[in-house]
Amino acid sequence: QRQMCIRDRTGSIYSAGMGYALTFMSMIYAMQWKGIIVEAVTLTLLTVAVLAVIYSKGVRVGSRMKTALITCLWVSIIGGLLFMLLAWLAPHSAIYTSIVAINNGPIGILFAAIGVLIAAALLMCDFETIQMTVEQGLPAQYEWYASYGLIVGVIYLYLKILNLLAKIANNRK
């Protein structure tokens, strides 16, 4: 009983922290581009709804697709870390300024769109995890883990859509 109380408290603190961080990031985007938050939230909700309908119709993510998604996710994480390291070590180098210039143009929009597609496909994996958890009759603890994964997936999709909209808006200027 006591352990469950600590876990509940930790989850609440984590959720509040995540909410504040998400609000802070959204406010930064909102200061730069008017109306972008409403657009991002609307597109995120529409995407989740469409993906839920598609999943309910029987479309599934195969094992090869899951492997490709995880690979893409790891490549993007490692690439992002390398970019941050380059920005920290050599912010005025030709390589860094070239990457920034490319990232703010059409190629950056393309990569942002690919990020949205990866986030959407990962959401399909979350739907499958939830379905398998329920069908196999796993304990409620695993249902909570699966629902947590879904929430993280929706937040990730929102951030990717927000990034894509910002790149599109920035490219119009």
Kindly give the residue locations of the regions a language model identified.
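Helix-coil boundary and interhelical linker segments in multi-pass alpha-helical membrane proteins
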Residues: F24-I37, N170-K173
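Hydrophobic alpha-helical transmembrane segments and adjacent interfacial helices
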Residues: Y20-M31, A49-Y55
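Structural signature of hydrophobic alpha-helical transmembrane segments
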Residues: G11-S12, K34-L46, I109-A119
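C-terminal transmembrane helix-loop-helix hairpin of multi-pass membrane proteins
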Residues: I102-K173
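Alpha-helical membrane segments in multi-pass integral membrane proteins
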Residues: K66-F127
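Cytoplasmic-side transmembrane-helix entry/capping segments in multi-pass membrane proteins
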Residues: D8-M18, I37-L43, R64-W74
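Short, small-residue-biased leader/transition segments that mark boundaries at the very start
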Residues: Q1-I6
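Small-residue-rich segments of transmembrane alpha-helices in multi-pass membrane proteins
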Residues: S15-I28, I70-F83, Y148
